Amino acid sequence: MFLQVTGTATPAMPAVVFLNSWRRPLSIPLRSVKTFKPLAFFDLKGGKGMSEFHEVELKVRDYELDQFGVVNNAVYANYCQHGRHEFLESIGINCDEVARSGEALAISELTMKFLSPLRSGDKFVVKARISGTSAARIYFDHFIFKLPNQEPILEAKGIAVWLDNKYRPVRIPSSIRSKFVHFLRQDDAV
């Protein structure tokens, strides 16, 4: 039932034992992975739809750089998260309050396309918007542009899933859904 242990065990460092059933994850070819198509969960006729971006201006800090003097790729996920949270807060959804209630809005997928690097002191804008929804998911688009010339830096797509207190996907609560509908139906003149 157990594999042979490699190395020797010491009192300070016990040997690690793997079950025979442990297997390396299989690689799935990209062509076999299903792509998602967001469902039209909200009736958005007559509103500005999902074209409105929320913008947040930021500045690169020295500790966000890698050994090559550019922003580390992992930091861009933080920038996108900040943009999403600011966007949600602007329409009346506070992520901290959601967490305190025992529920969560968690990113299940985030795909990023890096177009150009940012360096220390660069000013940039993160643009976030809702691109679609389903019963339990919210689809986001994110863009990062360097200021002042609006040079494209990053394009990202994310899927956020509404989770209950056991971290299982559930329908987006009607109180939250109504905030999305209110925002998305606002007239362009407002």
From Swiss-Prot:
It comes from the Eukaryota. It is found in: Plastid, Chloroplast. Its main location: plastid. Pfam families: 4HBT_2. Residues 1-49 form a transit peptide. One of its GO terms (molecular function) is fatty acyl-[ACP] hydrolase activity. One of its GO terms (cellular component) is mitochondrion. Highly expressed in stems and flowers and at lower levels in rosette leaves, cauline leaves and siliques. Keywords: Chloroplast, Hydrolase, Lipid metabolism, Plastid, Transit peptide. Belongs to the 4-hydroxybenzoyl-CoA thioesterase family. Acyl-ACP thioesterase involved in the production of fatty acids and beta-keto fatty acids. Can produce fatty acids of long chain (14:1 and 16:1) and beta-keto fatty acids of medium to long chain (8:0, 10:0, 12:0, 12:1, 14:0 and 16:0) when expressed in a heterologous organism (E.coli). Possesses thioesterase activity for lauroyl-ACP (12:0-ACP) in vitro. May play a role in the generation of long fatty acids in the chloroplast. This is Acyl-acyl carrier protein thioesterase ATL3, chloroplastic. The gene is ALT3.
